[in-house]
Regions:
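Hydrophobic, well-ordered beta-alpha structural blocks that scaffold small-molecule cofactor pockets
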Residues: 134-171
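N-terminal ligand-binding/catalytic initiation module
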Residues: 1-144
Length: 171
């Protein structure tokens, strides 16, 4: 698949293909927009059936992050990255370390975080070689679950709908 003619390319600013044969790394970083600030979006580790499937996913997800960050009023653009691997792989940490060097090479143009297959502990591994990582386990108290943020976001969305429909936010 030619990246520029891919249906989901949609004028992405950057698409970086990451490869490190010493650990078997295949990954993609997609930066959709930096108009509002550095691109931000999670790092997904998933055993995609093909590079084309991974490319389609990362392009769609990074564009979605542009809209998500803008709608949340954040000074962030949209980006996303994928590592084509099974998160239960015995060399998972080596893959994360190798991949993080590619994120670091962007110098803050893209910030990554947790996503499918990459949790806060894995974010700590990414942060060993990269300063542009959100949601690291080391940033939270012992036992804290980042799913609390997901739940809060869902609740705030319900409140916003309630305010719009019924002019009430007390649920």
């Amino acid at each position: 698949m030619c990246v520029f003619s891919a249906t989901d390319f949609d004028a992405h600013e950057d698409v970086l293909f990451c490869h490190d044969p010493s650990v078997g790394l295949l990954g993609i970083i997609a930066i959709h927009s930096t108009k509002l600030g550095p691109a931000a979006g999670g790092c997904r580790m998933y055993p995609y059936p093909s590079v084309d499937a991974a490319l389609t996913d990362v392009l769609r997800l990074s564009k979605g992050m542009s809209y998500k960050n803008a709608m949340a009023g954040l000074p962030l653009g949209g980006g996303k990255c994928v590592i084509i691997a099974d998160p239960s792989s015995p060399n998972r940490d080596e893959l994360l370390r190798a991949f993080s060097k590619h994120v670091q090479s962007l110098g803050g143009k893209y910030w990554t975080a947790i996503d499918v297959g990459v949790g806060p502990k894995e974010a700590d591994v990414l942060a060993e070689n990269c300063e542009y990582v959100f949601a690291r386990a080391s940033q939270y108290p012992e036992g804290f679950s980042v799913s609390n943020f997901t739940a809060l976001g869902g609740f705030m969305g319900i409140r916003a709908v309630s305010k719009h429909l019924w002019d009430k936010t007390d649920l």
